A protein has these predicted regions:
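Short, solvent-exposed loop/turn elements at beta->coil junctions and helix N-caps
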Residues: 17-21, 180-185
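Conserved ABC ATPase signature
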Residues: 186-249
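Short, well-ordered loop/turn elements at secondary-structure boundaries
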Residues: 27-28, 171-173, 234-235
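Electropositive, glycine-dotted interaction segments
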Residues: 41-183
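Conserved P-loop NTP-binding catalytic core
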Residues: 1-54
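Short acidic, glycine-rich loop/turn motifs
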Residues: 33-41, 64, 196-203
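Short, glycine/acidic-rich beta->alpha junctions
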Residues: 25-27, 42, 159, 221, ...
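A generic structural signal for beta-strand entry/edge sites
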Residues: 28-30, 82, 187-191
C-alpha cells in the first residue's frame, strides 16, 4: 500500500475490515506503526498512521520526535473528495513541490506514493520511506513456512546461539541444533538435527539426536519463529506475527 500507485482514483484499496460484528465493515480501518530510524548517530522516533476505507484515505499522518514533543512531517485529509496535504513547519519543501505532491495524490493512494513521483527530496520522508519499504518484514501467518530460513540461519554462530537460547527459554530441552547435508540421487539435501538433553536418573545427562520428522509441530514452529525474531532484531526491522500461538506448546 505504501508505494502502490493506482491506475485511477476509482480503483479500490485492498483492505479487509473486521467482519465479526455488524458495524465494523461499515467503518474505516486504522493502522499505525511506531519505529526508530537513525539520523546520524541519533535514533529518532517516527509514527505513521492511516485511516482508510476501500475507496479512499480518510486521514494519513507522519510525525517524528526530535524532542519529547512530536513534530508533524505531513498531515493528509479529505476535503470535498480531494486530498489535502499539510506539511510541518520544520519540513523543508518548496511551494511548487507541495502543489505537485498534492495534485498527484489520488484519494486512494498514500502520500508516500505521490511523493515518489515528484522530483524532490524531503529528508524526513526519505528516512521514513526507507524504513517502511526496507525494514518491514513480510507478516508471519499460520501457513507461513519458516523452516528453510531457520535452517540457513543456524549456520551462523550468532543466530544459532540466539535460537538455542530462545528454545531453551521456551522450556524445550534442546541442547543443540545442527544443519547437515546428505547426498542423494537428486543432489545434496539439507536437513536439521535436534539434540535433546535428558536426565539419565543417575545424576548425569544423556543426549539424543532426532531429525525434524520426529519433532513436534510446536518445536518446528518455535524454531522457525525464533530465527525470524532474531533477524528482525538484528535488522532493526518490524515483524508482524498473526496467531503467534498457532501450533506452539
Amino acid at each position: 500500500f505504501i508505494t502502490c500507485t493506482p491506475l485511477n482514483k476509482a480503483e479500490l484499496i485492498k483492505i479487509v475490515p473486521f467482519l465479526l460484528n455488524r458495524t465494523s465493515k461499515e467503518q474505516a480501518s486504522e493502522f499505525s506503526v511506531s519505529f526508530y530510524a537513525m539520523n546520524g548517530d541519533k535514533a529518532i522516533r517516527y509514527v505513521y498512521s492511516v485511516l482508510l476505507e476501500t475507496t479512499h484515505i480518510v486521514r494519513e499522518t507522519l510525525i517524528y520526535y526530535l524532542s519529547q514533543q512530536p513534530a508533524t512531517v505531513f498531515e493528509r485529509s479529505m476535503e470535498n473528495n480531494v486530498s489535502s496535504i499539510k506539511f510541518g513547519q520544520k519540513v523543508k519543501i518548496s511551494t511548487a513541490a507541495k502543489e505537485e505532491i498534492t495534485l498527484k495524490c489520488l484519494p486512494n493512494m498514500s502520500v508516500f506514493a505521490a511523493y515518489m513521483q515528484v522530483n524532490t527530496n524531503i529528508a524526513e520522508m526519505e528516512t521514513a520511506l526507507q524504513y517502511l519499504t526496507k525494514q518491514m518484514m513480510p507478516a508471519i501467518v499460520p501457513t507461513s513456512s519458516l523452516s528453510r530460513y531457520a535452517e540457513e540461519a543456524i549456520k551462523k554462530e550468532t543466530a544459532k546461539e540466539y535460537i538455542l537460547r530462545y528454545l531453551q527459554e521456551a522450556d524445550f530441552n534442546i541442547s543443540n541444533i545442527s544443519s547437515k547435508e546428505q547426498e542423494t540421487k537428486k543432489g545434496v539435501v539439507n536437513y536439521t538435527m535436534y539434540q535433546h538433553k535428558v536426565s539419565s536418573g543417575l545424576g548425569g545427562n544423556d543426549y539424543y539426536e532426532f531429525p525434524e520428522l520426529y519433532e513436534s509441530d510446536g518445536t518446528i514452529r518455535t524454531f522457525g519463529l525464533a530465527s525470524q525474531i532474531q533477524n528482525s532484531i538484528g535488522s532493526n526491522a518490524f515483524l508482524a506475527v498473526d496467531e503467534i500461538e498457532s501450533s506452539l506448546h
